[in-house]
Amino acid sequence: MVAVLQSTFAIIFSMEFIVGTLGNGFIILMTCIDWVRRRKISLVDQILTALAITRITLILLVFIDWWVSVLFPALHETGKILRMYFISWTVINHCNLWLTASLSIIYFLKIASFSSIIFLYLKFRVKNVVFVTLLVSLFFLFINTAIVNVYFDVCFDGVQRNVSQVSRLYNHEQICKFLSFTNPMFAFIPFVTSMATFFLLIFSLWRHLKNMKHNAEGCRDVSTIVHIRALQTIIVSVVLYSTFFLSFFVKVWSSGSPERYLIFLFVWALGNAVLPAHTFVLIWGNCRLRWASLSLMLWLRYRFKNIDV
């Protein structure tokens, strides 16, 4: 039964890896082409490119970790491999979450409409806001990485004092429990940021529709469409964070229980599926990427028709 589950989820993870790599690779390719053509790159494209690179790296890391755990379980449980994997995962996932939050901030400041002095001040300084946000994230990244590194150092010291506890100290389950406490704690700030921008955009859209109704105008103007597309992007970001938190809680709940192993694999697959899903939402929410993807699909459809003929 376990072998069947591993084979099934191996196929699922492989499909997620392929789809996620293609989607994020498309974003990187189109952004680079546009950068070379225009000789400049916008702030949104910079964040999208950095996010796409981070996503590819994260998906690749999880994909490799899965296959190493299946094919080489003894190697997967060694201290050096665990330290390398979890520190790498902590850094890459941290960048993924904060870049996603930064993208939500950009959409909010560029699209929302408020008369507050503070909002207007931030609206005309979007680059500075994003720069400060990412700078603050580096501080939290340093603390998070240091905590994980210290935890492994304590494990190494324990092994040197008591060799008989090697398997327990380097147990993948124990480290997952530890990270299930630290990583959600450091992901809380970008999660709250995305939630705040989501609700503020809803409020901005509600005010906009109310004003249009009062002025007896149509409800599908350009501003409304832009609001809705931004909300679609941010709501998937919120789902991404929610799945992130859920996966860690399920890891703690299902650890040490073979009966809950299926639930653990399902939530893990769901968490990994959110990444490529969010990528395609980003493509659909960006006008340039959306038209490029539609053009690519039409070209592929035309090529396949010619092959059939």
From Swiss-Prot:
Glycan-linked positions: 162
Compartments in which it is found: Membrane
Keyword Cell division: no
Protein known as: Taste receptor type 2 member 113
Topological domain ranges for the Extracellular compartment: 1-8, 77-101, 149-185, 251-262
CDD domains named among the record's database cross-references: 7tm_TAS2R14-like (cd15019)
Keywords attached to this entry: G-protein coupled receptor, Glycoprotein, Membrane, Receptor, Sensory transduction, Taste, Transducer, Transmembrane, Transmembrane helix
Example of a GO cellular component annotation carried by this entry: membrane
SUPFAM superfamilies found in the cross-reference section: Family A G protein-coupled receptor-like
